Amino acid sequence: MRKRALIYMIMAGTLALSGCRATSQNTAANASAVEQSAAQDGQNENHDGNGAPDENGAPDGKEAPGGKGGPDGNGVPGAGQSAPESYDAVDEITSDTSESGKTYTSTRTDENAILVSDGATLTLKNFKLNRTSGDSTGGDQSSFYGIGAAILATDGTANLNGGTITTDSKGGAGVFAYGDGTVNISDTTITTKQDTSGGIHVAGGGTLHAENLTVETSGESSAAIRSDRGGGTMTVNGGTYTSNGSGSPAVYCTADITINDATLTATGAEAVCIEGLNSLKLTDCDLSGNIPDNEQNDCDWTVILYQSMSGDSEVGNSTFDMTGGSLTSKNGGMFYTTNTESTFSLNNVKMTYSDSNDFFLKCTGNANKRGWGKSGSNGADCIFTATEQDMKGDIIWDSISTLEFTMKSGSSLTGAIVDDETNAGNGGDGSANVTIDKTSTWTVTGDSRVSKLVCSGTIVDNQGKNVTIKKSDGTVIKKGSSCYTITVDSYSAS
């Protein structure tokens, strides 16, 4: 997989980015620099969406901003899009401004209600903002650069408190930080109604800090917490974030995002989608997802870490870190990683599984119809660490992937560990290494296959019987009375 990363980066670098339109003043310099970086990245924010079967879409398919290609969805979001030379805005803030109790309205096509540029600082308190446009186009220009967002900061700072933001237009993100823009927003309600309209959004290296927001989105490719090409940094403290649209996770992550004490809900998509060299850290959050069945996907998941090769994020290790709080799956399996390097860390999270609970963790190649990597060589390299964590469901791996799975500090797993070569092509030299410390327990529910097993803890079946452990050549290492067998290449008790 690490060798494949170099190949992916070369592939990504070949993506050509062409021009598009422009309308007001400012911000082209930063956009140009970020655009060059994005072109090298070689990804596209398709995660949220319902990507086209033959394109490089995001997992859920529709979150491909205009290009269509989220895990669920319709294709490549942004090949051929370049940064705008200018923006069209009702109010462009180019010097320090402070206002309170005002109402702002925007109705024109693909315009911003408020644009902060030229290093200015805007402070708004107790404000109302309405953006409505039936002719706006949304798509990649909105996802990557913030065209059509209600409030956009490209080179300056927007401090927003006690407001209400409502958008009813394609590409109508609530607030958007791009490039050298920073948004600090608190105690505000954001409602977006159409496609490609995230609640809070960063791209191109922007910075956003949110506190105690109430955010609800309804369109496709409209994650309540959303990022896109060029990434950025986002910190969220408190609040409620709900995504209702198809292909709209609660969190769509192509940035470095930290969320504390928030409620995060996706009613028509996976809970979380992370692509490429990006990270999501959750502490004491309540997170839930409900991905629909989709014939383009070879499985259903609640949290996905992957690489679509669409061009929206840099190839590299995807990181999901969750401590405390709860994670609820309404359909399919829990964690899926494919065509990427990934790191998962779970610490004392309350888990609620779907009725099917297809898997706890799937670390394999894929046969996704949108083409996430080359079939037969698109596995995952995954490090998964569970601390004080109860887990239920099977772990699935294949020979074109590598898995390092560690249980410690009183963790437990109830399930089988299965080598499934369905999407491994001609196979490879992958492995699944499992380490169980002396305080942790694996309750085996089916015959299992592990490359290297290190266990100073407990391994039994669901009746409390010891499980037979044998080598792949048939040599019995530990004879048990259970009907289940764990086959290993190597075994150690410490």
What is each stretch, according to the model?
Residues 66-83, 129-154, 172-173, 177-179, ...:
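Acidic/polar low-complexity surface segments
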Residues 73-136, 483-487, 491-494:
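N-terminal segments that cap or nucleate solenoid repeat domains
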Residues 106, 131, 167-169, 192-194, ...:
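Residues in short coils/turns that link rungs of repeat/solenoid architectures in beta-rich domains
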Residues 353, 378, 382, 386-491:
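Extracellular beta-solenoid/beta-roll
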Residues 96-101, 121-127, 158-162, 182-188, ...:
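All-beta strand scaffolds that present successive hydrophobic residues in beta-strands
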Residues 1-11:
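Positively charged n-region of N-terminal signal peptides that target proteins for export
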Residues 16-19:
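C-terminal motif of bacterial Sec signal peptides marking the signal peptidase cleavage site
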Residues 21-85, 370-374:
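Disordered, low-complexity segments in secreted/periplasmic proteins that are enriched in proline
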